[in-house]
Amino acid sequence: MKLGTPRWWYVKSGAPAPVTRALLTPLSWLWADTTRRRIARATPAIVGAPVICVGNVTMGGAGKTPIVRELLLTLTQRGVAAHGLSRGYGGKLKGPVRVDTIRHTAADVGDEPLMLAQDFPMWIAADRVAGAKAAVRAGASAIVMDDGHQNPSVKKALSLVVVDGETRGGEWPFGDGRVFPAGPMREPLKVGLSRADAVIVLLPVDVEQPDFDLLVAFGDMPVLVARLEAAAPVPKGPQVGFAGIAKPWKVEKALTAAGCQLVDFAPFPDHGAYSESTLKMLADRAEVYEAGLVTTEKDWVRLPPAWRERVTPWPVRARFEDPAALEALLKGIGL
């Protein structure tokens, strides 16, 4: 059974679950040390095209996928043959394989690659070097690698760290700074940022400016600000929402902020498959309220085809506040 993300991870004060945090802290030291050693031992491979890595320093929920989409779109519009590369988390195929939206399902290649493959060439590969080289052989002149900041196997031309810009209500993207499993960090913040070329702060749909204290946390690092925007109106009338992402509560907030008449909302674990019984439960709940069903695009691609007709996907897109800053980074690597 997949477990959901503990919300107490993201409380800046570290006050919730003090006993749990204390008990898990020795495992955090082990995790951080193992990650550091693995990265230090690696010799990154040159794959024949510039690789832009979109990663993060937390366990999930930062918003990498919308940034990957926006980078692929930007590069494609500039005439670059940009391909996406993902590990394919949640899928059974190891790759390298190019995602085929007709032949593959989320159970094969993972939900995020399947979603992105609707618009861009996408590859999944457990071996990122093999996946990148396969993309180059297929004509890629640039590769956008999703979630590879702690993967040292591929030589990166540009490393971008995405950070969740939600800081309201005591929430903080790094929690109290502890490494997994005592906190949300994949590695200590300073260690992760030392390998990055820039930070992207991704703001929720209803936040105007990034928190000043958050910007201070990055020191002298270049920081780009992007914002999530609705790519379509929310469905009309009462809705029962559901989402299985790292931070499902963000979807509930975003739908409400966009004017959706949510009468109920159900969170599920990230990348989890939806069983027929679960979907029937959601449909029954919606029937009680005489409501529709709404979810994210990422969740929608995990639904069986018959259920996709009964659920409305609500798409969001990332938009950079200063496109010129992104352009300067891309020009710096010859793109």
UniProtKB/Swiss-Prot annotation:
Q: Which cysteines are joined by disulfide bonds?
A: none
EC number(s) from the headed UniProt entry: 2.7.1.130
Instruction: State the superkingdom.
Output: Bacteria
> What Gene Ontology terms describe what this protein does at the molecular function level?
ATP binding; tetraacyldisaccharide 4'-kinase activity
Q: What is catalysed by this protein?
A: a lipid A disaccharide + ATP = a lipid IVA + ADP + H(+)
Top EC class per UniProt?
transferase
The protein's name is Tetraacyldisaccharide 4'-kinase
Organism from which the protein derives = Caulobacter vibrioides (strain NA1000 / CB15N) (Caulobacter crescentus)
